[in-house]
């Protein structure tokens, strides 16, 4: 099996509470019939939240961690996953939530924004046969960055309101050529 680097950045925002509060004020929407994700999301038109230019911060961190990587487009979303989404699957959640972020997507990442989350509610990574290889814990204000072609998914959903559920900023870096 190929060894792949997963980057972890602690204490990503200087003001995570303000960023979180601003995001929670937004109108989250469920997926459309053509979307391939579960939960609710906001796809922002303005990438500045609580005085933070998210695109610039993410871009700088990715370039620092993966110096030779270039991309054509960054897609951002604020994503909430609650305990309720378990009802959408007939199999164990961790098995059902495994996925690749394909097409033109090359690098993906997320920033955890729920304070004091339960244990075992981070992001799981799997080998090509679907066996769990590792899990990164959901730690408030931590960013993770990884290749889009790694099989992965949220380990466990939690919460029953947008304030106490799994809140993340997800980003997808796409290369079209």
Protein language model regions, located:
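Non-heme Fe(II)/2-oxoglutarate
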Residues: 1-96
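Catalytic core of non-heme Fe(II) oxygenases with the double-stranded beta-helix
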Residues: 79-177
